[in-house]
């Protein structure tokens, strides 16, 4: 029964392993379904663990029957009663319980194609290029014949496509093909050895007759082909022997320990099972177009095609794994175990590629693997660099936080805090960076440069923190200096003397020396340079001087200094040398005392006007080197700061003091006048004489005397109990309340009178109008 209607046929039992497929139809078209069919056979993932065998020979010689018996295939067989062509084109089927793909090639010398031998030549060449073992099926009586034994076809194939075999390895150890001649209906009259010798002789004759290139003239057929020969009894006449010999022949295909095992590794075309369809299709295309068949090139093309497919599949899976991690990296987050994940993705992709692609052409496989690694790394590299940047930012933030936390306490060593934070930052970054490296030592996976950038920024942050802490420390020392010099300076300026500025400057220098010692002691842990210490000390001196100058300004303001001058003047004018207050008498020398006290006081104004200690060692000078402290450096003139009172201010102060001193002088003069104008003593005698009767009346009147005693006793008790003040306050409060109540009553009375006046005003106006009206009427009557 012909099988040309369908490309794929399945037996009724539905077993996919028994399906057969027409890979090339009678119109010389290659099927696109071979890859799918190989997968249905379960051979797609076999790699090199499969074999491929083909059969060709004359039409109706039982090729399909032989294959079905040998391999358990399901090819259609000829209807012996009709003797017509059964196999058209090339069919393929899997051997039963065998990893063998079997090709059944259309028979040659058939009446259906007649003189058209093009397909015969192309199918034979296709079979030679694809199969490990090529079974040449012939009858015993065809041995020695040229056409019947297909010698003419083999010669044509060898002659036209000599390049196919010439490009194989010169040592003949690779790319070899086994030609298995199966001689059917062997009677036994002619021994197999004789038949074998005849066939070998014919094949060598064909090979020798070929026109070969100069570099292949000495090559023999055995350099490229191995040949094996076997016979089978008549299938119809001796069926039992036929089946027995077929079974023996089958063992040569299945039993690797068999001495005559046919599927030797040297015959394998090294085409992985998943690439067989593509390889065969390209071979057929080359054969169909009558192009020189270059098997190595075809193998490379197949390798490129399959390696690209495998690489694309591995890359697609890799991209699906890597995609979810892009967003957190772009968002600036550090992804935990990113390096381990990337290495796993990369390893999985390469493992998948290696598992399937390593079976193909070594050069292509290696080249495509390199390309795949480059693509994978180009995807992983942004993740790696992003992870480094995020680690950089995270470590820098942590470093700043660690420093700030370490500087919160009262007692801390700045250098230790910075070093501890720096070590932790460096360790965290290096551990994270090393973990993120996909391939250690490979180009594009270095993180040392990013580490250097991080350390530079860490150094900059540490320097800034050191500067801030230095300023903070200087500010603290400045406040301490201000606190320490405030009271002593105020005391020295309040009690002026010729060595006043010596005392002030000594106090200032002692305090400044302590401040500098405090700074240097703390600055050791800051790892400050000599230049930084010099600038800091210069800034500290300026700040301390400004603090001192501010205190002096406070104590020498107009009111404060005028008060000091008045106090100094009063001590010398109002008090004697022993500090006893003076009560001026008319005969005292007020003018002399006033002049002396005034002159001594005015001598203080030049003393206050300029900071100038008598001891030259106590003179203070600011360093002339520049400082970056803007707070103390803005237009600061040290020379002018030594002047406390300008000439104008001194003159104004002197004038104000003279006015105050003159007031004290006038007051002193008035006190002497008041002592002169006191009541004469004789007036007291007059008062006693004139008031004696009234005094006696009070003393001898019981009522008045009792009231007097009560008043005196009450006054005594109030004074003894200290109730004088509270009593006066109560008296004032009562008087104030009485006054308030009286005022309110008076306002009410006045307000009521005004209201009555307003109410009576309309009535008065009406009466006035009536009076005027009556007067007018009276005048009219008198006129009449």
UniProtKB/Swiss-Prot annotation:
Residues 1-678, 724-784 are cytoplasmic. Pfam families: RHD3_GTPase, Sey1_3HB. PROSITE patterns: G_GB1_RHD3. GO terms for molecular function: GTP binding; GTPase activity. Residues 764-784 are annotated as: Disordered. It is a multi-pass membrane protein. Its EC number is 3.6.5.-. GTP binds at residues 57-64. The keyword Endoplasmic reticulum applies. It is an enzyme of class 3 (hydrolase). Signal peptide: none annotated. GO terms for biological process: endoplasmic reticulum membrane fusion. Residues 47-267 form the GB1/RHD3-type G domain. The keyword Nucleotide-binding applies. Belongs to the TRAFAC class dynamin-like GTPase superfamily. GB1/RHD3 GTPase family. RHD3 subfamily. Cooperates with the reticulon proteins and tubule-shaping DP1 family proteins to generate and maintain the structure of the tubular endoplasmic reticulum network. Has GTPase activity, which is required for its function in ER organization. This is Protein SEY1. It comes from Coprinopsis cinerea (strain Okayama-7 / 130 / ATCC MYA-4618 / FGSC 9003) (Inky cap fungus).
